[in-house]
């Protein structure tokens, strides 16, 4: 697990490695009382969405053909609509979840529905237990979002792209990840022609 302390009293940024993420997904899959937890973790790590954005997700906003889902203004922190692109991992998690919903609460409008078909409201206990089973300490649900952003920046993705994917209203918030970019300075100066 990696962490970054921020100046000015801002909250910490924690992220986990890919092997820790695999262990967490495996541990989340054993949560008998929260069978949707595994797919929630997979989707959060693949999209960077906030917990409430995912828990409020309805099937009619998921477009499997175009590989994205829509977050409406009332579901986002900054009140702006956004399209969330889906990679193969996110699509797989959504398909698995669709399967579960079809078997246990067919007709539910919620992606993360309980067996009664109602929207899942809280994952905290199951998530904490899954972290313990995976041997991951001091890791919150929101840290799945930090993990997504950290992985992207470490892969060289522009902070502006990460900002848009996370739905940040300002690049200032996203800049907390800037130091993770492996070659941000080196790549910039290479764009200049030699004199």
List where the protein language model places each region.
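Short basic/aromatic active-site micro-motif
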Residues: 36-38, 44, 137-155
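Active-site/catalytic core of tyrosine-dependent DNA strand-transfer enzymes
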Residues: 19, 66, 75, 87-137
């Amino acid at each position: 697990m990696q962490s970054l302390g921020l100046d000015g009293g801002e909250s910490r940024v924690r992220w986990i490695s890919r092997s820790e993420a695999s262990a967490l997904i495996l541990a989340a899959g054993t949560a008998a009382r929260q069978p949707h937890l595994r797919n929630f973790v997979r989707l959060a790590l693949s999209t960077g969405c906030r917990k409430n954005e995912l828990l409020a997700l309805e099937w009619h906003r998921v477009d499997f053909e175009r590989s994205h889902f829509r977050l409406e203004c009332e579901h986002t922190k900054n009140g702006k609509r956004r399209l969330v692109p889906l990679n193969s991992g996110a699509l797989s998690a959504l398909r698995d979840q669709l399967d579960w919903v079809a078997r246990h609460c067919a007709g539910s409008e919620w992606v993360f529905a309980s067996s009664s078909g109602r929207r899942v409201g809280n994952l905290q206990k199951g998530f904490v237990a899954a972290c313990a089973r995976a041997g991951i300490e001091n890791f919150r649900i929101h840290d799945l979002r930090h993990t997504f952003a950290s992985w992207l920046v470490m892969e060289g993705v522009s902070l502006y792209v990460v900002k848009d994917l996370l739905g940040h209203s300002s690049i200032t918030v996203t800049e907390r990840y800037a130091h993770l970019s492996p070659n941000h300075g080196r790549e910039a100066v290479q764009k200049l022609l030699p004199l």
